[in-house]
């Protein structure tokens, strides 16, 4: 079912490392990351702009949008 799929995806990506493929700017709003073989819409959990190719960590998921922060 769709709910089981969403739970599986959540388990796979939460806390995971992703590569930014489209500049993340919450004001526009734009942003995408690549993780686990798929590209996802993304927003910055801190509000900072994150440039393409930066590595980020997935903090939370709302619907099909990932909230990320830059890796240290």
Where are these regions (language model features)?
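Short boundary/loop segments of OB/S1/cold-shock single-stranded nucleic-acid-binding domains
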Residues: 1-13
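Terminal membrane-proximal soluble interaction domains of membrane-associated proteins
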Residues: 10-72
